[in-house]
């Protein structure tokens, strides 16, 4: 390859000095190869380093001069005003709680306050328990082996039940409900009263079976009335014999 062709090719590109990375686009930064590397950070002052060697892209290694450091005016301008670092105006930053309600900012630790409030309520409930309302179905039921008290009927209830018994000793389910509602009793109480009344009638009449119909009951009453004079005569005869 001829030198003429190489020279014509490289004449279109920049030299090695201009190919060095330029970190900050400043008009005052020129010939950075002869200056120490400047590192910018969050601190106010710029720190710099003196590397022993910098590998050149095209001209090989070259030693740096140890001349006293002079701060670049571009570095002062760039570091002094971080807002204009890239040529833009600084952004107006707002506080995290600036747009919120001031009351919320005042009580930032809401979770701890809520937890403490719940703890106080739990302690208060343990110290002063509120009385609970007891319903009849919530009370303990009577034991299986425990005997219930004897049911007492008023004179009015007994009279009405006797009338119903004379009219019909056996009640249907519908009539039993009507009688229980009229007398203020339960169906079970009415049923038990009629069972006891039929057993009492059997003992009084010396019958093993209660009459199932009203006609049979009337016949039994007639027989009882016919036997009454005979029993009276027998009683008078016994009294005469004793005299």
Curated annotation (Swiss-Prot):
User: Among its keywords, does the record have Transcription?
Assistant: yes
Repeat as a keyword?
Answer: no
PROSITE patterns membership: ANTENNAPEDIA (PS00032), HOMEOBOX_1 (PS00027), HOMEOBOX_2 (PS50071)
Short name of any one Pfam family annotated for the protein:
Homeodomain
Q: Which UniProt keywords apply?
A: Developmental protein, DNA-binding, Homeobox, Nucleus, Transcription, Transcription regulation
Region labeled Disordered — which residues? 203-243
Residue ranges: DNA binding: 146-205
User: Where does it live in the cell?
Assistant: Nucleus
Q: What is its main location?
A: nucleus
Instruction: Please provide the Gene Ontology terms (biological process) for this protein.
Output: adult locomotory behavior; anterior/posterior pattern specification; dorsal spinal cord development; embryonic skeletal system morphogenesis; grooming behavior; negative regulation of myeloid cell differentiation; negative regulation of transcription by RNA polymerase II; sensory perception of pain
Q: Which SUPFAM superfamilies match?
A: Homeodomain-like (SSF46689)
Q: Which InterPro entries match?
A: Antp_homeobox_TF, HD, HD_metazoa, Homeobox_Antennapedia_CS, Homeobox_CS, Homeodomain-like_sf, HTH_motif
Q: What does this protein do?
A: Sequence-specific transcription factor which is part of a developmental regulatory system that provides cells with specific positional identities on the anterior-posterior axis.
Q: How does it assemble?
A: Forms a DNA-binding heterodimer with transcription factor PBX1.
Q: Which family does it belong to?
A: Belongs to the Antp homeobox family.
Which PANTHER family did the record assign?
A: HOMEOBOX DOMAIN-CONTAINING PROTEIN, HOMEOBOX PROTEIN HOX-B8
Name listed for the protein in its UniProt record: Homeobox protein Hox-B8
Q: Give the organism, scientific name.
A: Mus musculus (Mouse)
Please name the gene that encodes this protein: Hoxb8
């Amino acid at each position: 390859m001829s030198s003429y062709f190489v020279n014509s090719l490289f004449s279109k590109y920049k030299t090695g000095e201009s190919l060095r990375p330029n970190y900050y686009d400043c008009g005052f930064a020129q010939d950075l190869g002869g200056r120490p590397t400047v590192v910018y950070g969050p601190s106010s002052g710029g720190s710099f380093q003196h590397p022993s060697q910098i590998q050149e892209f095209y001209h090989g290694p070259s030693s740096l001069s140890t001349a006293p450091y002079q701060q670049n005016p571009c570095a002062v301008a760039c570091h002094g005003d971080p807002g204009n670092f890239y040529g833009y105006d600084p952004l107006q930053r707002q506080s995290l709680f600036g747009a919120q309600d001031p009351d919320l900012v005042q009580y930032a630790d809401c979770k701890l306050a809520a937890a403490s409030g719940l703890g106080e309520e739990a302690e208060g409930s343990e110290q002063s328990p509120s009385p609970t309302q007891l319903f009849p179905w919530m009370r303990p039921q009577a034991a299986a082996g425990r005997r219930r008290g004897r049911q007492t009927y008023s004179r009015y209830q007994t009279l009405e039940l006797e009338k119903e018994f004379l009219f019909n000793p056996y009640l249907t389910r519908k009539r039993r409900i009507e009688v229980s509602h009229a007398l203020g009793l339960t169906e079970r109480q009415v049923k038990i009263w009629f069972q006891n009344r039929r057993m009492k009638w059997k003992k009084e009449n010396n019958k093993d079976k209660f009459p199932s119909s009203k006609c049979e009951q009337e016949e039994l009453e007639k027989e009882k009335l016919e036997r009454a004079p005979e029993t009276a005569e027998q009683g008078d005869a016994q009294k005469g014999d004793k005299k």
